[in-house]
């Protein structure tokens, strides 16, 4: 069992993430101040909603410097959905600067015939490299998405998995050293989500 810090900044699906991790035997500590993270082995930044209000909430709760220090120190970190997007420098959705931990930006999902926005529902993960959650050739991992914007990193090598969206492929997962982030919702992805969370937890130092 680990103590996992869940950043509580008013924009996260706190209940479902907590319930999912507690079902795996983990202890969850809600973090509104980083003094509460001292006993934690990993931090999760969840997120649902819009980019600007989320960043403003992080700014107003004075969590940004400590969050960056946590990630830069090499400790385990997981971003979920909007929690992935906030890691980048900016978003077409708003005007507030992102955390800038990752270089790149968040763009509106392109309009494609017969594809709806938001991109919503169950889709198969397509690994682009062997990573903490998936082997390169591992298929049949279907997970739940709901988003209207997607990440375009400057360094494509940090993309760990993609998802098909019509003729396009969108970023589904990012991995950069100790930082892992999912555009999909593992906590809403049934047995597959449980399996992926178990793999992440097993890699926590």
From Swiss-Prot:
Residues 3-205 form the Glutamine amidotransferase type-1 domain. Keywords: Amino-acid biosynthesis, Cytoplasm, Glutamine amidotransferase, Histidine biosynthesis, Hydrolase, Lyase. GO terms for molecular function: glutaminase activity; imidazoleglycerol-phosphate synthase activity; lyase activity. GO terms for cellular component: cytoplasm. Its main location: cytoplasm. Its EC number is 4.3.2.10, 3.5.1.2. This is Imidazole glycerol phosphate synthase subunit HisH. It is found in: Cytoplasm. Pathway: Amino-acid biosynthesis; L-histidine biosynthesis; L-histidine from 5-phospho-alpha-D-ribose 1-diphosphate: step 5/9. The keyword Oxidoreductase does not apply. The keyword Hydrolase applies. Pfam families: GATase. The gene is hisH. It catalyses: 5-[(5-phospho-1-deoxy-D-ribulos-1-ylimino)methylamino]-1-(5-phospho-beta-D-ribosyl)imidazole-4-carboxamide + L-glutamine = D-erythro-1-(imidazol-4-yl)glycerol 3-phosphate + 5-amino-1-(5-phospho-beta-D-ribosyl)imidazole-4-carboxamide + L-glutamate + H(+); L-glutamine + H2O = L-glutamate + NH4(+). The active site is at 81 (nucleophile), 185, 187. IGPS catalyzes the conversion of PRFAR and glutamine to IGP, AICAR and glutamate. The HisH subunit catalyzes the hydrolysis of glutamine to glutamate and ammonia as part of the synthesis of IGP and AICAR. The resulting ammonia molecule is channeled to the active site of HisF. PROSITE patterns: GATASE_TYPE_1. InterPro entries: Class_I_gatase-like (IPR029062), GATASE (IPR017926), Imidazole-glycPsynth_HisH (IPR010139). Heterodimer of HisH and HisF. GO terms for biological process: L-histidine biosynthetic process.
